[in-house]
Amino acid sequence: MDLGFAVPVSGSWATPEHMVHIARRAEQLGYHSLWTFQRLLAPADLGWSETYHSVQDPLTTLAFLAAHTTRVRLGVAVLNMPFLSPVVLAKQTATLDILSAGRLDVGLGLGWSDEEYQATGASKHRRGRRAEEFVTVLRGLWQDEVTEHHGEFYQVPPTRMDPKPVQRPHPPILLGGLAPQALRRAGRLADGWVSGSQADLAAIGAAIATVKATAADAGRDPGALRFVCRGAVRVRPGGPTDREPLTGSLDQIRSDLGRLAEAGVTELFVDLNFDPEIGSPRADAEASRRRADEVLDALAPRR
């Protein structure tokens, strides 16, 4: 199982200096990838988790870090398709793949925030079918010399989009979502599946099995798919025995990583943005960076 690390994008520690520090340190330590996530806004009463109160844009962050790294892959988990144009996203991500010399992974999801749906003018009606068409348009723009699409939701006249991404036929698409239909969609359409912050990690093997079975039914090779897990790590030594996976001492977290690999996860990225003691506006930014350094060193793949 490959290990990645989420860069600071949420809360007080999400500064340019800390982003570069974490990205470079992760690359030096042998981590496979760096990750971000998307959150456009938060409700005025701030009723959500503090992780979502102040979040940097994911693609802009990855473009910034592409200039400060050379080897690690750069991923977003996830961009929410209902809020985006597949044509604009195709251009943005093709450019980012070029700037990063072919290191981009594109995670896509449907979103869950009513506030974001309303603010962006998006509709939840038939959003699953719209997502499938979104992926079709995105792939066509990335890989075809001339693409044309006439569907229920998107109309693309005979069109060229250049320059193309470095990765051929296109950057990997990882679809998110926990609902059965989302898992089946990933098996039919995507290059892999990425779990969200609310995923039941104890049951992740069943989700992976659903994706694989659907891929096989569609005539695809399940063994070629990637299964990426967002590891919302919280280092809490001396915690309760009935702890959540990836919450506990570093030794316990290492054991959890092994169990997730056995469950079929092919890549996990450690995400401290979802620790309220780190990824919140009220957290001490320097203390958060120091804690991240400790986790980076302790879980480094080379050890």
Regions found by a protein language model. Name each.
Residues 5-16, 79-87, 167-178, 237-251:
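Active-site mouth loops of central-metabolism enzymes
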Residues 3-7, 34-36, 74-77, 104-108, ...:
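Hydrophobic faces of well-ordered beta-strands that scaffold small-molecule active sites
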Residues 8-10, 39-41, 79-81, 109-115, ...:
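Active-site beta-loop-alpha junctions enriched in small/polar residues
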Residues 27-28, 32, 125-166, 196-303:
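An alpha-helical appendage that flanks or caps ligand/catalytic pockets
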Residues 18, 42-49, 63, 76, ...:
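Internal, glycine-rich beta/alpha segment that forms the wall or movable "lid"
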Residues 1-68, 169-171, 273, 278-298:
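N-terminal beta1-alpha1-beta2 module of alpha/beta enzyme domains
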Residues 14-26, 88-92, 175-185, 246-260:
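Short, acidic/polar
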Residues 68-71, 100, 187-193, 264-266:
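Glycine-enriched alpha-helix->loop->beta-strand junction motifs that scaffold or abut catalytic
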